[in-house]
Amino acid sequence: MKRSVFLVGIVAALVVAWSVGWVQGQESKEKLLFVSASQAKYTAMSGNSSVSVAPIWGNSDTEAHGTFSKFAPGYDAGMHTHTNDVWIVVIKGAYLYKDDAGAKRVGPGDFLRVPGGHKHWSGGDKKDGALFYEESSGKFDFIPVK
């Protein structure tokens, strides 16, 4: 019995030591990341020439990510949802947002959180469009709502 308790203690200590080492190894791989929105490389979003994106970190096709995104002037995304939460900070222009509670004009320096599964409409200002930083807790998707 004493030997079993002792062995369980040893195994637990090894698991903890390995976990701490693994976490520290992950943290040491993190590096400072600086990207200028004006210098970023934007590409048109697949299937939509009115939206362009510049990946900052992660992969929006498969995982949590951060991107600079641009809506062309007057862009209308229509009613839709996303599976995962989306956090937005507008840099330039205006991100137009509407849901059942009303409409919002989200301007430079403003923050907007859209919960996953929340039905909403979004678009770009008619004159300036919108440039914003967008971050999500998972892959990006666009689910049209009728």
Task: Give a label for each model feature.
Residues 9-19:
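Bacterial N-terminal signal peptides
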Residues 116-140:
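Ligand-binding loop in jelly-roll beta-barrel domains
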Residues 62-82, 115-117:
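Conserved short histidine dyad/triad with adjacent acidic residue
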Residues 1-10:
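Bacterial N-terminal signal peptides that target proteins for export
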Residues 21-65:
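A short, N-terminal "cap"/entry segment at the start of jelly-roll beta-barrel domains
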Residues 72-75, 82-100:
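Glycine- and acidic-residue-biased ligand/ion/polar-headgroup-sensing regions
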Residues 60-63, 75-76, 94-97, 119-121, ...:
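Solvent-exposed loop/turn segments at secondary-structure junctions
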